[in-house]
A protein has these predicted regions:
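N-terminal pre-Walker A segment at the start of P-loop NTPase domains
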Residues: 1-18
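Short phosphate-coordinating micro-motif centered on Lys-Gly-acidic
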Residues: 2-4, 85-90, 96-150
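Phosphate-binding P-loop
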Residues: 22-27
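Hydrophobic anchor at the beta1->P-loop junction of P-loop NTPases
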Residues: 31-33
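P-loop (Walker A) phosphate-binding loop of NTP-binding proteins
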Residues: 36
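Conserved lysine of the Walker
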Residues: 41
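Short beta-strand-centered segment that lines the nucleotide-binding/catalytic pocket of NTP-utilizing
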Residues: 55-69
Length: 150
């Protein structure tokens, strides 16, 4: 199953899809969350957090601080790079220790990583289908044959 495309009709359904996807994740995994503003990246992150036994109410987008850390079944590192002007700024939060650590890294606006982007990562692309519907496409670009289930 190289790529899965789904349509979500609500935030609750997006969180449920993310929760099912989270069952495929293991320590050291990096998940890129791509999409325009309001596409559902943080909602998807909340669904993963809930599946990792982190209260979804605690999860918010770390736009102004670059990263939040949540403790659950595994540590969850949630990056929001929207305001990042230079990938070198990530060194101030020692991002590589998190990316290659014992938890799961969720990265909103991953295109801002520039040359620091890890080769191995999941890609979750979210886009607006309508006001309430979202297209969700999940893949593992560096190994399209990596199997996962939803």
């Amino acid at each position: 199953m190289p790529e899965v495309s789904l349509i979500s009709d609500s935030e609750q359904e997006t969180m449920a899809i993310a929760g099912r996807f989270a069952k495929n994740l293991k320590a050291g995994d990096i998940v890129f969350l791509e999409g325009e503003l309001g596409a559902g990246k943080t909602v998807f992150a909340k669904g993963i957090a809930r599946a990792m036994e982190v209260s979804a109410r605690k999860v918010n987008s770390p736009t102004f601080i670059l990263m939040n850390v949540y403790q659950g079944k595994l540590p969850l590192y949630h990056f929001d790079l929207y305001r990042l002007e230079n990938p070198e700024e990530l060194k101030t939060v020692q991002f590589d220790e998190y990316f290659y650590g014992q938890g799961i890294s969720l990265v909103e606006w991953p295109e801002r990583l520039g040359g620091l982007s890890p080769k191995e990562h999941w890609l979750v692309a979210l886009s607006h289908k309508s006001e309430h519907q979202r297209n969700i496409c999940i893949s593992y670009p560096s190994n399209p044959q990596r199997k996962f289930s939803l």
